[in-house]
A protein has these predicted regions:
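Bimodal feature
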Residues: 1-2, 19-22
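Sec-dependent signal peptide recognition
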Residues: 2-8
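Glycan-recognition and catalytic cores of secretory/periplasmic carbohydrate-active enzymes
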Residues: 22-243
Length: 243
């Protein structure tokens, strides 16, 4: 019995020691930047390399085949034609792939991929309207998709306009952190400034939720790289407005 009692005390002391060094709720949680993470094992490293050499180029090729890039070129007045695709959120395909490609550049620099991203970002910049607005099906006035976006910008919650913006922001931050280039980041900030102007609790602003979560995360990331409080406030507004 005495041995059991001593053992119990020992376990209690050990647990107490563990508790004293555990995480405290008032401590900030800071993620490890992806630019500082490099996987070199024999399982994941080869797959990451396949992603760089096969998957990412294939994904961009699908954007070329399915008109994702053409929509940006059309919105920018670089080509003539009709808007392609069946959804208002097709713009996010290039954004998502740019984000992934940026992670890849941080792992292993690829000058060909870097230059390709520059060319895609040029198209995206051409499609952006002077005040920062960026959703190609709206700029291109694609009547086929009116059931999604209506007849003017910001008209319907299910338009995915803010969803598009959120993925743009995430791609822009990843590209900036991986390359140091501001080309896509400046496009994203111009769009975010428009969102901060048009949405919110103030008079004359749209008092609505985002319609589809992702812009909240994107705005928070913009805040982290710019230290501009308005982006974090905008993210908080959308979260609270959603309820």
């Amino acid at each position: 019995m005495q041995k059991k009692f001593v053992l119990a005390i020992g376990v209690a002391v050990a647990l107490g020691a563990c508790h004293s060094t555990s995480y405290h709720s008032d401590e900030a949680i800071v993620e490890v930047p992806f630019t500082e993470v490099h996987v070199t094992d024999h399982f994941w490293a080869p797959r990451i390399e396949v992603n760089r050499t096969v998957s990412i180029p294939s994904a961009f090729r699908q954007c070329e085949i399915n008109g994702r890039f053409d929509n940006f070129a059309l919105a920018g007045g670089l080509i003539k034609g009709e808007h392609k695709g069946d959804f208002p959120f097709d713009d996010t395909d290039p954004y998502k792939i740019i984000e992934g490609a940026s992670y890849s550049l941080a792992v292993k620099y690829d000058p060909k991929l870097d230059a390709y991203l520059d060319s895609v970002i040029t198209l995206i910049g051409a499609a952006q309207e002077p005040d920062g607005y960026l959703t190609t099906c709206v700029t291109n006035k694609c009547e086929r998709l009116n059931r999604w976006w209506g007849s003017k910008r910001w008209e319907k919650l299910n338009s995915h306009e803010l969803y598009n913006s959120g993925h743009l922001y995430e791609a822009a931050v990843a590209h900036y952190q991986a390359t140091g280039k501001r080309s896509l980041l400046d496009i994203a900030l111009k769009n975010a400034d428009l969102v901060c102007k048009d949405f919110g609790p103030g008079e004359g602003q749209k008092h609505v939720p985002s319609g589809h979560p992702i812009i909240e995360m994107g705005l928070a990331k913009l805040y982290k790289v710019t230290d501009e409080q308005k982006y974090l406030d905008m993210a908080k507004y959308f979260v609270e407005e959603t309820g």
